[in-house]
Structure formats: structure tokens, C-alpha cells
């Protein structure tokens, strides 16, 4: 059994980086506090996660299940690295993709009420190695709900890769199998993570400002 890594642990007192050090779209200039995880660091960590995934799951057909919308950037980049490993290996395996859409946030709070509002026929997961790819684990309730749903289709194996895991007292204790970064209890946006659908077009993971929260509040 593989030991779960906490990922790159970012401390509670990590200040992040000044916005002026990076290219930030002008329309978000007043809406962010700091750059928290630069895009290059995200990509380097994702490349290593791809290797870990293939080491643990690469013996059988993998179905990569993307949790939309926030997971799509991480999903695309992770799969690019996995595909590169697959085509350069002496032993390659088939890989297919599926998508599911969940809703559990309003403004900056997880509602605790997870709704499946889109997705393909999950019966295709039966007997497969399933890799669920998520942007962030906050309380963990959303992922527990999704795992219960997926397991109804009797996959051979289910593993979860999450770019971010938040340290929060609201956590139910769930930890994914593959973690990019463990972060403090801050509301972050960018790299497809949104605040009421805004900020998905940022390359970096950033901390939203109070001005930004007020501006884009639902």
C-alpha cells in the first residue's frame, strides 16, 4: 500500500508573492491580495504527480474523471504529463476520460449540499481503475459524496488526485491519494478555481481580496 504524501505543505504564515512580480490581468488588479502558488510551481508539481499516478495505477485501463468546472486546468495538465509518460514507456496502458459537474459553493463558503448537475453515464467506470481529478479539497464532504456515487458502479480501483487540500477546522478528515499542495485556510482563486465563476482565467493560484469578494459576490 503506497504511503500518502501530504504534498507540498505551505505554512500558515506563508506570505505569497507581490502581484507586481507576475503578469496579472488588469481587470483583476484590485481584486487580489497576493500570488500564492506561481504557475511554474504548479506545473512542476503536477509533473511529479503524474509519475506517482502511473506508478500506482498504471497496470490497468485508467478512466480519468474530471470534476468540473474547477478541475479542468489541473486535469488537462496532469493528463498531458501522464500521456507523455505513457507513450515513452515500454509498457503503456489505455486511458479514457469522463466528466462530472458538481456544485457545492456559494460565494466563498462550501454549502455542504453537493449537487451533481452534469456528467456522462458513469456505468463506463465498472471494472476500471478510476482517477478522480479535483481542484481543491475543502471540507471533504463533496468528495465523500462523489466517491459514494462512483463506487456504486463497481470500479476496480478508485484514487483521487487534488491540486490543493485546505487545512481547515471544517474538514471531515478526508485526504486524497495524490496531493499537489496543502494550503492554509484561505480562499484561493485562479488556475480554473473560481469565485462565482470569476478568476478562472488566471494562470497562478492567488488569494482573493475583500474588494474582490465584494465586487463579485452573488
Swiss-Prot record:
SUPFAM superfamilies listed in its UniProt record: PRTase-like
Subcellular locations according to the entry: Cytoplasm
Binding site for GMP: 69, 134-142, 166, 186-188, 194
Principal subcellular localization: cytoplasm
EC number of the protein: 2.4.2.8
N-acetylalanine carried by residues: 2
Gene3D superfamilies: 3.40.50.2020
Job of this protein: Converts guanine to guanosine monophosphate, and hypoxanthine to inosine monophosphate. Transfers the 5-phosphoribosyl group from 5-phosphoribosylpyrophosphate onto the purine. Plays a central role in the generation of purine nucleotides through the purine salvage pathway.
PANTHER family: HYPOXANTHINE-GUANINE PHOSPHORIBOSYLTRANSFERASE (PTHR43340:SF6)
Name this protein carries in UniProt: Hypoxanthine-guanine phosphoribosyltransferase
Annotated gene: HPRT1
Amino acid at each position: 500500500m503506497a504511503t500518502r504524501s501530504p504534498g507540498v505543505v505551505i505554512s500558515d504564515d506563508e506570505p505569497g508573492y507581490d502581484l507586481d512580480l507576475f503578469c496579472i490581468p488588469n481587470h483583476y488588479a484590485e481584486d487580489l491580495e497576493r500570488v500564492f502558488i506561481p504557475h511554474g510551481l504548479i506545473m512542476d508539481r503536477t509533473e511529479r504527480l503524474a509519475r506517482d499516478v502511473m506508478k500506482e495505477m498504471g497496470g490497468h485501463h485508467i478512466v480519468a474523471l474530471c470534476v468540473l468546472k474547477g478541475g479542468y486546468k489541473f486535469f488537462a495538465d496532469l493528463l498531458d504529463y501522464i500521456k507523455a509518460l505513457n507513450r515513452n514507456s515500454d509498457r503503456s496502458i489505455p486511458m479514457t476520460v469522463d466528466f462530472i459537474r458538481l456544485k457545492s459553493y456559494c460565494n466563498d463558503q462550501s454549502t455542504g449540499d453537493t449537487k451533481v448537475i452534469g456528467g456522462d453515464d458513469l456505468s463506463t467506470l465498472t471494472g476500471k481503475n478510476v482517477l478522480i481529478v479535483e481542484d481543491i479539497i475543502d471540507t471533504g464532504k463533496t468528495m465523500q459524496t462523489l466517491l459514494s456515487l462512483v463506487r456504486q458502479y463497481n470500479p476496480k480501483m478508485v484514487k483521487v488526485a487534488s491540486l490543493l487540500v485546505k487545512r481547515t477546522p471544517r474538514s471531515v478528515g478526508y485526504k486524497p491519494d495524490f496531493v499537489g499542495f496543502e494550503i492554509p485556510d484561505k480562499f484561493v482563486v485562479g488556475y480554473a478555481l473560481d469565485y462565482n465563476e470569476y478568476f478562472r482565467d488566471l494562470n497562478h493560484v492567488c488569494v482573493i481580496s475583500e474588494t474582490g469578494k465584494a465586487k463579485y459576490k452573488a
